[in-house]
């Protein structure tokens, strides 16, 4: 099963194609807006959303071309539903849902922080459930017990304001 992942929670546009059977990334493409936002002393949500709008399709096309894949190979689409900046999240959601509709494939909303937590399992496939994991990312700090890929219980949690 090939899953297209779309990440637009803040100021970086990310696209990746993941092979769930082989447990490997087919391609990943990232566009950073850090230089643009550094001029303003922080992320400007409207500018971030516009850049996502302009970069998603070219990143997808490049990834597919470079990996000799096509849209027809995609079995499902996963996108960041939050947390994140409202405008950028809306762009990613609209792109994922539109593409999913056009391809007639399932579209899966993903909690950004839980995806980070589950990367421990990707990096160490031998890791057995349940396991404890610590995430420090931006304004979020999470200590969690991961029971399975769909069951996370938060032991300690802080979040950005």
What function would you assign to each model-found segment?
Residues 2-83, 112:
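N-terminal beta-alpha supersecondary unit
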Residues 3-5, 78, 88, 131-135:
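Short glycine-aspartate micro-motif
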Residues 13-18, 133, 141-145:
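Short beta-strand scaffold segments in enzyme catalytic cores
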Residues 27, 153-154:
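A structural microfeature
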Residues 79-103:
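Short Gly/Thr/Asp-enriched flexible loops that form oxyanion-binding sites at enzyme active sites
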Residues 105, 109-132:
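Conserved phosphate-binding catalytic cores of ATP/NTP-utilizing and phosphoryl-transfer enzymes
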Residues 155-161:
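Conserved small/polar residues in nucleotide/adenosyl-binding loops
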């Amino acid at each position: 099963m090939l899953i297209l992942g779309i990440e637009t929670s803040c100021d970086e546009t990310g696209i990746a194609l993941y092979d769930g059977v082989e447990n490997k990334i087919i391609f990943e493409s990232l566009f950073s807006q850090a230089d643009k936002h550094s001029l303003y002393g922080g992320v400007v949500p409207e500018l971030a959303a516009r850049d996502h709008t302009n970069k998603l399709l070219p990143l997808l096309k490049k990834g597919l071309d470079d990996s000799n894949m096509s849209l027809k190979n995609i079995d499902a689409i996963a996108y960041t539903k939050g947390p994140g900046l409202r405008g950028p999240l809306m762009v990613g959601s609209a792109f994922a849902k539109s593409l999913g509709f056009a391809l007639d494939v399932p579209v899966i909303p993903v909690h950004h922080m839980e995806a980070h937590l589950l990367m421990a399992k990707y990096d160490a496939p031998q890791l057995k459930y349940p396991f404890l994991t610590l995430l420090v990312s931006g304004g979020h700090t999470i200590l969690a017990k991961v029971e399975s890929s769909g069951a996370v219980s938060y032991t300690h949690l802080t979040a950005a304001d």
